[in-house]
């Protein structure tokens, strides 16, 4: 790992959760000094793995908002991940003064599931049906809640009656009713570089969810006797290598998402950096796209030393976290930081 002297004094900073280990390790691989803002009591992994040159302990992540001047004075660059938006909220993230890797104008399109759907439609991607009211339910559906909370609270229903019975336990949260597509779930990890204009397919994963990934070990009769209800709480991620014949369509979908993003709110910059498409591949090998995450996703943590696909391209360990740091380093070398920071 290179000495921490890269980048004309700039440091890479993030908050201690989600993919912070990967982000900071990747930054150190590219020679950056690193800063971690961590809630008290959660610092042990970061101390053990020694990824943070500076560890700032806080009672709550939201205290970052009060230390922006310190981060500015240290020339810190914030790398967002899923916990950012739960910790601060969309409006506070949009108002951050510390340089931020990514396009903040895209965030509202990711955060609102209906706006996100509009974006994906503009990209010409195939989407599952959305039901406006429970009374429209005419087959299996999955009810999803807004926000990056790891699938918490999602549930299945087959009728309006079943929907109303299950939603009682989850009242007060905004949701969408989405057609349930039978197939293989695949999360595609992309990186788009505004410096080169090139899209990279970094890796793939599938989620390991409780209890849906263990319920199959229980016979159907016993499931009925026990009255088990399927849940989708994410506990981890599993690596995937896709059929090579699927790669052209995977590249096409990513490029379409980036191209469509440049037309959102008249912003010609659009989406850049890491992002992910949540897909299901049906038995006839058709992709349905459920969601887009306009940031690094936790599934990339599988590949801290790179994936089979980054091995082909880089011939050296290249995680998504390291790829972010390399993009920043290149922008500094080209005197073009304004292109990638908000």
Question: How should each PLM-predicted stretch be described?
Answer:
Residues 23-32:
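A short, Lys/Arg-enriched amphipathic alpha-helix followed by its capping loop at the start of a domain
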Residues 32-41:
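Short internal beta-strands
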Residues 42-140, 149:
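Conserved N-proximal alpha/beta basic substrate-recognition cap immediately N-terminal to
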Residues 106-205, 244-256:
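Active-site nucleotide/adenylate-binding loops and adjacent lid/helix of ATP-dependent enzymes
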Residues 276, 282, 312-342:
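Peripheral (often C-terminal) accessory segments that flank ATP-dependent C-N-forming ligase machineries
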């Amino acid at each position: 790992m290179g000495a921490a002297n890269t980048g004309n004094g700039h440091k890479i900073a993030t908050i201690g959760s989600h993919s912070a280990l990967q982000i900071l390790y990747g930054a150190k691989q590219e020679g950056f000094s690193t800063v971690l803002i961590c809630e008290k009591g959660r610092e042990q992994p970061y101390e053990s793995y020694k990824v943070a040159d500076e560890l700032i302990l806080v009672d709550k992540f939201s205290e970052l908002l009060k230390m922006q001047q310190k981060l500015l004075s240290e020339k810190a660059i914030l790398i967002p991940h899923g916990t950012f938006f739960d910790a601060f909220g969309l409006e506070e993230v949009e108002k951050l003064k510390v340089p931020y890797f990514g396009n903040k104008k895209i965030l509202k399109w990711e955060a609102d599931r209906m706006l996100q759907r509009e974006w994906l439609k503009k990209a010409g991607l195939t989407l599952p049906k959305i039901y406006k009211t429970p009374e429209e339910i005419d087959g299996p559906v999955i009810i999803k809640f807004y926000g990056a909370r790891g699938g918490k609270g999602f549930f299945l229903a087959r009728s309006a009656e079943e929907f109303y019975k299950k939603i009682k336990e989850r009242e007060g949260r905004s949701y969408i009713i989405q057609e349930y597509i039978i197939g293989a779930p695949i999360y595609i990890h992309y990186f788009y570089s505004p410096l080169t204009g090139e899209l990279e397919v970094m890796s793939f994963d599938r989620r390991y969810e409780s209890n849906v990934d263990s319920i199959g070990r229980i016979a159907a009769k016993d499931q009925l006797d026990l009255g088990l209800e399927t849940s989708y709480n994410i506990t981890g991620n599993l690596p995937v290598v896709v059929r090579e014949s699927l790669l052209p369509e995977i590249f096409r979908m990513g490029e379409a998402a980036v191209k469509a993003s440049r037309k959102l709110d008249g912003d010609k910059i659009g989406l850049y950096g890491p992002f992910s498409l949540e897909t299901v591949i049906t038995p006839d090998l058709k992709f349905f796209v459920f969601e887009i995450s306009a940031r690094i996703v936790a599934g990339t943590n599988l590949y801290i030393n790179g994936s089979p696909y980054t091995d082909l391209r880089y011939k050296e360990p290249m995680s998504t976290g390291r790829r972010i740091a390399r993009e920043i380093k290149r922008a500094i070398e080209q005197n073009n930081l304004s292109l990638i920071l908000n």
